[in-house]
Amino acid sequence: MAAIQGIEGGISQLQATAMAANGQETHSQSTVSFAGQLHAALDRISDRQTAARVQAEKFTLGEPGIALNDVMADMQKASVSMQMGIQVRNKLVAAYQEVMSMQV
């Protein structure tokens, strides 16, 4: 989480610098933070994986009303969500490294 806060701080500094260069005043925004959005996305990925695992366990135990095609679809949704999360993380790390390597 420290890396996420570092990225958020860097982005805020860049935005303040860009606004100052354009002659605009900097003011705090009351919108949701980048870190908050990232945390919410990670929670949704985790929830989707948990739901798929629970449904697979119910199917394995033979509970009625749980079809194999529903289990497989939910498992694929969870897998795609995780892969997307990993790709977003990789892009964020690459962007952070690029920003940190810039000369001021």
UniProtKB/Swiss-Prot annotation:
InterPro entries for this protein: FliE (IPR001624)
GO cellular component: bacterial-type flagellum basal body
Keywords linked to the UniProt accession: Bacterial flagellum
Highest taxon, organism lineage: Bacteria
MF (Gene Ontology): cytoskeletal motor activity; structural molecule activity
Pfam family, one: FliE
An annotated GO BP: bacterial-type flagellum-dependent cell motility
Locations listed in the record: Bacterial flagellum basal body
Family in the record: Belongs to the FliE family.
Name by which UniProt lists this protein: Flagellar hook-basal body complex protein FliE
